[in-house]
């Protein structure tokens, strides 16, 4: 056996008891592991996640307690309170067994995040006339992370116990 393949996938769609609020998300994660001889293997993978949902900040207060309204009431604007994120990541892991309990492992990951969120929500407590002030914000950002880790481990027995020694970068 010199290769193994795997595909993880998920999807979810959910409504809320609040009027106008919902959530949809899905993800895929194909991976493959290739044997490069008897002592070395490389695993390559990709992850994609998409998440879209209504941002719900809950109920405003009135006289120090939650405002008395039906549980399905959305305070703010559900149509303008959305959050979206997309995550794409590539990774590679190289494992090599030297023998006698000595192992080298290098992990690399590059991930890009694209996020947007916006919310129209109660910006004040409900006043005695039954009114409140709405507030709003939005934010968008993109970020790319690069990660690399190298570990050298050695398993030894000493003092009646098995130990793992670790050196890494």
Predicted regions and their residues:
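Extended alpha-helical regions
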Residues: 29-31, 71-125
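A short linear-motif detector with a strong N-terminal bias
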Residues: 20-22, 82-84, 130-131, 144-150
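Extracytoplasmic loops and strand-loop junctions of Gram-negative outer membrane beta-barrel proteins
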Residues: 12-15, 69-79, 129-138
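Transmembrane beta-barrel wall of Gram-negative outer-membrane proteins
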Residues: 1-54, 82-93
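Short linear motifs at secondary-structure transitions and domain/linker junctions
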Residues: 6-8, 66-70, 79-81, 126-128, ...
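Residue-level preference for alpha-helix termini and adjacent loops
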Residues: 2, 16, 20-22, 101, ...
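Face-selective signature of the C-terminal outer-membrane beta-barrel domain
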Residues: 86, 90-113, 136-169
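Outer-membrane beta-barrel and related beta-rich outer-membrane complex signature
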Residues: 19-21, 41-76, 110, 114-124, ...
């Amino acid at each position: 056996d010199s290769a193994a393949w795997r595909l993880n996938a998920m999807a979810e769609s959910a409504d809320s008891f609040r009027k106008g609020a919902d959530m949809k998300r899905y993800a895929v994660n194909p991976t493959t592991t290739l044997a490069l001889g008897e002592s070395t293997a490389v695993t390559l993978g990709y992850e994609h996640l998409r998440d879209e949902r209504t941002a719900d900040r809950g109920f405003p207060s009135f006289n120090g307690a939650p405002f008395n309204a039906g549980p399905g009431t959305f305070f703010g604007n559900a149509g303008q309170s959305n959050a979206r994120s997309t995550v794409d990541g590539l990774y590679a892991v190289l494992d090599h067994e030297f023998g006698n309990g000595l192992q080298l492992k290098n992990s690399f990951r590059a991930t890009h995040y694209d996020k947007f969120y916006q919310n129209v929500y109660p910006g004040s407590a409900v006043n005695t006339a039954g009114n409140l002030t709405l507030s709003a914000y939005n934010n968008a950002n993109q970020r790319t992370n690069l990660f690399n880790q190298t570990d050298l481990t050695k398993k030894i027995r000493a003092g009646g116990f098995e130990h793992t020694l670790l050196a890494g970068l």
